[in-house]
């Protein structure tokens, strides 16, 4: 078993646009990138493990020797989105928890939406189970196509955390979370932080 702290997978066009750390080679054309944050004991095992899956190590460095440049973690989660949109302002993004197994959902979305979707995956755990979250980059073609895309994701069993709405409730579970409201009351009783962001606070 490999002890991994985090896993990020970037589709080739996304990987090609990222500002890789000093010493890390740029991806070859068409090369996807898998970013792994591994325990020190796993570093010797990784090359053989990846080779068995048809991959190879492009760059490997211990955290203590990474230097003061851009950290690899800067290419994960929403950092990836920000780097892409700095170069491609005509794009936006979504946040999804994919159904398990994921391949059928991704294939169906790719077939319908083509290169209007570029894929970025993050490994997560939900109730102890390994899952894939996705932060796909989306070519902006207007509000109606975006709504149609989100509806298609939901039809395929993906959970959409909509980043294009104001309140936390509308972007997530769709209902007021009493624990969130209680936490805001405890830590921000005057409601100064992120005003209007928590619908449950406004409706209390």
What annotation goes with each model-predicted range?
Residues 1-74:
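C-terminal substrate-binding/cap subdomain adjacent to the FAD-binding core in PCMH-type
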Residues 25-27, 52-204:
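Conserved glycine-rich FAD pyrophosphate-binding loop
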């Amino acid at each position: 078993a490999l002890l991994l702290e985090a896993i990020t997978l970037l589709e080739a066009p996304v990987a090609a646009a990222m500002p890789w750390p000093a010493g890390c080679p740029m991806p070859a054309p068409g090369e996807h990138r898998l970013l792994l944050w591994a325990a020190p004991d796993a570093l010797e095992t990784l090359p053989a493990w990846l080779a068995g899956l048809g991959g190879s190590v492009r760059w490997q460095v211990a955290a203590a020797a990474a230097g003061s440049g851009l950290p690899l973690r800067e290419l994960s989660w929403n950092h990836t989105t920000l780097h892409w949109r700095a170069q491609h302002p005509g794009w936006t993004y979504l946040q999804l928890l994919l159904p398990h197994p994921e391949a059928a959902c991704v294939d169906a979305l790719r077939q319908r939406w083509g290169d209007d979707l570029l894929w970025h995956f993050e490994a997560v755990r939900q109730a102890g189970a390994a899952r894939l979250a996705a932060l796909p980059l989306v070519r902006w073609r207007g509000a109606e196509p975006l709504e149609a895309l989100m509806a298609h994701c939901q039809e395929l069993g993906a959970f959409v955390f909509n980043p294009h709405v104001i309140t936390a409730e509308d972007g997530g579970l769709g209902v007021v979370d009493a624990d969130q409201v209680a936490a805001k009351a405890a830590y921000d009783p005057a409601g100064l932080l992120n005003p209007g962001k928590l619908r449950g606070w406004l409706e209390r």
